[in-house]
Amino acid sequence: MAKFIVLLSLVAAIFSVLICEGEVESMKNLEVDLGFSQVPVDSACEGRNLSPQIEIHGLNSTSLAIIVDDIDAPSETFTHWRIRSIMPLDLIPAGMPNNLEITTPLKAIQGSNSFGKIGYMGPCPSKGKPHRYYFRIYGLDRMLDLDPEATRQELENAMKGHILQQGEAMATYQR
């Protein structure tokens, strides 16, 4: 009988963990809408190089961080934008200024991209095949206390354990 009770307790504990994991997993989903599947020229190096508008649905977090990567770059993943400490907004407006600290149209801190510049730098792949650009949005449980010039690795380390929600959208660009 004692073995049965222990086994029953173990099954109940496993079931409880599975239910909790399911709740956490479903809570993490954000719907991210760029309004396009191909990056417009205005948001690329050949155009005005403006960060695109990003709509975020299902947001229930204290702050946001956004990382935009080209996963098809020849040598390694190429980061086009890192922005963090954004108040939770359903709409990130287009054309964010390329300043380290932004005060308008919203407050945020931007990091350097793989070009070595602060702020958004649009797609600029070599001519040929299209590249895929992932816009990853992280809903965090707090504003991150980081040096304004923190590296990507420092940002990712600071986000560990604080991501409540996440979502992504992918768009392509070809020259």
Placement of each model-derived feature along the sequence:
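N-terminus-centered regions that define maturation/targeting leaders and the start
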Residues: 5, 9, 15-175
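Context-dependent free N-terminus signature
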Residues: 1-2
